[in-house]
A protein has these predicted regions:
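N-terminal capping segments
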Residues: 1-78, 83, 90-92, 96-98, ...
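Catalytic Cys-His active-site segments of thiol-dependent hydrolases/isopeptidases
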Residues: 100-123
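Intrinsically disordered, low-complexity, charged/polar segments
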Residues: 124-144
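Residues that flank catalytic or metal-binding motifs in active/ligand-binding sites
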Residues: 83, 108, 133
Length: 144
């Protein structure tokens, strides 16, 4: 399923960034991208997503994205990268994890696909500054 995840995620490239959205070609945020790939590969989303603010519960310290990832995705070791992995990022020390992406390439030039706030879904180098922020690595569950 790894390459299928990347193909599905790349279909979202260029989709404008829209907070709380998940509509291919019209608008999405980082969670919306993961939701859209889920729908494309697996089917209906496993739970309704409540409204959320851009700070992702930072004031309360609740790890909402991490909790959802642990409920619905398959946890992987951080040091076992594969194309198609869902990546969870903690943007700064002490903050909640609040950004998601999908690893598209591994090896000497790793890359990931993510919804870039204020812009669109892009494929970016998974440079050292980004890689150091990864706090979770997950796989989509197998269908069925």
């Amino acid at each position: 399923m790894d390459r299928q995840v990347v193909v599905e995620a790349r279909a979202w490239l260029g989709t404008p960034y829209v907070h709380q959205a998940s509509v291919l070609g019209a608008g999405t945020d980082c969670l919306g991208l993961i939701r859209g790939v889920w729908r494309g590969l697996i089917g209906a989303e496993p739970e309704a997503v409540p409204g959320y603010t851009a700070d992702w519960s930072e004031a309360s310290g609740r790890e909402e994205l991490l909790g959802a990832a642990l409920r619905w995705l398959v946890l992987k070791p951080l040091d076992a990268p594969a194309a198609g992995d869902v990546l969870l990022f903690r943007m700064r020390e002490g903050a909640v994890a609040k950004h998601l992406g999908i690893q598209s390439e591994t090896g000497d030039e790793p890359r990931f696909i993510h919804a870039y706030a204020g812009h669109a879904v892009v494929e970016s180098p998974l440079s050292d500054p980004w890689a150091r922020k990864i706090v979770g690595r997950f796989a989509f569950p197998l269908k069925g």
